[in-house]
């Protein structure tokens, strides 16, 4: 499995509640925070739903 680094680049203020919950599930609480994850189909769906708020890089 491949690892990725997810960074929150935009604030969650004013976004849909579902998107806020997705960011929290990814472990992102504030702008600029980073988390390392292993790629899975479930994670891909979560990243796709908040793609306008995050940046994804290969680890």
Swiss-Prot record:
InterPro entries: Ribo_uL30_ferredoxin-like_sf (IPR036919), Ribosomal_uL30_bac-type (IPR005996), Ribosomal_uL30_CS (IPR018038), Ribosomal_uL30_ferredoxin-like (IPR016082)
A GO MF term: structural constituent of ribosome
Gene Ontology CC: one annotated term: cytosolic large ribosomal subunit
Matching Pfam families: Ribosomal_L30
SUPFAM superfamilies xrefs: Ribosomal protein L30p/L7e
Domain of life: Bacteria
Keywords: Ribonucleoprotein, Ribosomal protein
Keyword Disulfide bond in annotation: no
CDD domains from the UniProt entry: Ribosomal_L30
Subunit architecture: Part of the 50S ribosomal subunit.
PANTHER family xrefs: LARGE RIBOSOMAL SUBUNIT PROTEIN UL30M, MITOCHONDRIAL RIBOSOMAL PROTEIN L30
NCBIfam families: rpmD_bact
Similarity comment: family membership: Belongs to the universal ribosomal protein uL30 family.
Official protein name in the record: Large ribosomal subunit protein uL30
Gene name per UniProt: rpmD
